[in-house]
Amino acid sequence: MRAITDEHLQAYLEGGCLQKLFNVIDEDPELSFELRVKGEVMIYYHKDKIMTIRFCKGKPSVEILFEKYYKKATPPSVSFMYDDLMETLRHTDQLRKYFKEAKRLIGSYKAGLEFEVQQNITLGNRSFNNRFVVVDMEWQLPQSDIKVEERISRTRIDLVVVDTKKNDMGENDIYLGELKVGTGATGGKSGIIDHVIKTNEFISNAKACAALRKDVESIIRQKAVLGLFEGDYTGLNLSDKPRMMLILVYRGSEERQVLEVQEEIAKDKARELKMAEPLLVWHNALITLEV
């Protein structure tokens, strides 16, 4: 289950040893704070893990970004090694310096328009006063306790979204959000079909659905305590079976026309599999200047 211990949670709050680190992460719209299994917290930047935080027996530990990002460059200068950790955590300027250096390394290694859109969608949907709330980014089904022959392939989900408007059954739907930015992300007919098949495989697996629902409940509760969500979530009645959401982001009419073809392909495949039609969300990424 995606949850951290109460002791770990308190460390991010007022007076906790991780409070300054949390504040630096929370104030930066390019960083995403996500709860993971085994009591870990992972911080993402451009879809890449920039930091992992653990807390055990009253003491924190911090793992920086993977060596692959600086194999041919200079690693971040800020130390999170055991002997230096508590001192580093006391200095906001050092924490900001780490993320600045780490971002630069990731940016050199991998750029991503898709993440920028994904992050902005997350930031714009953090309130339960809105129709939709993004609960988690890059969620992945833990399968270590599932037999190899029963495991589901490619279970990483771009966005886990909760609908605050109840459906006809009086439940709040959980959506597995798949993000497509521009025509370069569609991967042709097979790409969109693969995503529908993957989602249907997940939805048809009772263990996967139960694990997702349990995680969503836990994540909402703990992120609310940390102030990462706004509004009242106590009236939610989460559905047991998630649905698919397809978020199509276009830049101009030509990209929209191409993505409209992808929309029909997705709907046709869903009908063939006898699954609920994906909820389509359109977003124009072009910015029109106005005064």
Question: Locations of the language-model features?
Answer:
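Charged, terminal alpha-helix-loop-beta segments
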Residues: 1-291
